[in-house]
A protein has these predicted regions:
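Basic, glycine/lysine-rich polyanion-binding surfaces/domains
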Residues: 1-158
Length: 158
């Protein structure tokens, strides 16, 4: 669906109690993350797997008359939690994203490549970030993260 559509925005707001995020942003509350993926795509992220089928069917019903596709991609994604004061330096090793605090902050969301893997990431708090990648790349990406985080190869920059 076109995310600027008023009906779409009302449906999302009513269901999740969150505004549809603007370009390159993420909206959050204690239950959900709504991430801007493209002009016609948002990603809903929840930690409660039991809610996924309910969310999917409710959104499909509410958007019935709109051109919209609602998919559950949870089985094909992995989320890594990276904690510590050097997460910006770590991600800068493999991503072209400007990670200076003035450009990437608590409501920022980016899709990019990290270590040759398609990823998306967002801040949870100042010293923690979530990185989402495809399930099939999780082992490679974990090894890349471990290698990039080696204490002998990381210096404070940000």
């Amino acid at each position: 669906a076109e995310i600027n559509n008023r009906k779409f925005q009302k449906t999302i707001n009513d269901f999740f109690k969150l505004k549809v995020p603007s370009r390159l942003k993420i909206s959050t509350n204690k239950n959900f993350y709504l991430a801007w993926m493209s002009p016609n795509e948002i990603m809903v992220i929840t930690k409660n797997q039991d809610e996924i089928k309910t969310i999917k069917s409710s959104i499909e019903n509410d958007l019935d008359q709109m051109e919209a596709l609602v998919l559950d991609v949870s089985s094909s994604r992995t989320i890594f939690s990276i904690k510590g004061s050097f997460w910006r330096e770590l991600l800068a090793k493999g991503s072209p994203i400007n990670l200076f605090p003035s450009k990437f902050n608590s409501d920022s969301f980016r899709r990019t490549r990290l270590g040759q893997v398609s990823t998306a990431f967002w801040m949870i708090k100042e010293d923690e970030i979530y990185v989402l990648c495809g399930q099939s790349y999780k082992n490679f990406f974990f090894k890349w993260l471990c290698n990039a985080a080696d204490e002998k190869s990381i210096n404070k920059f940000f």
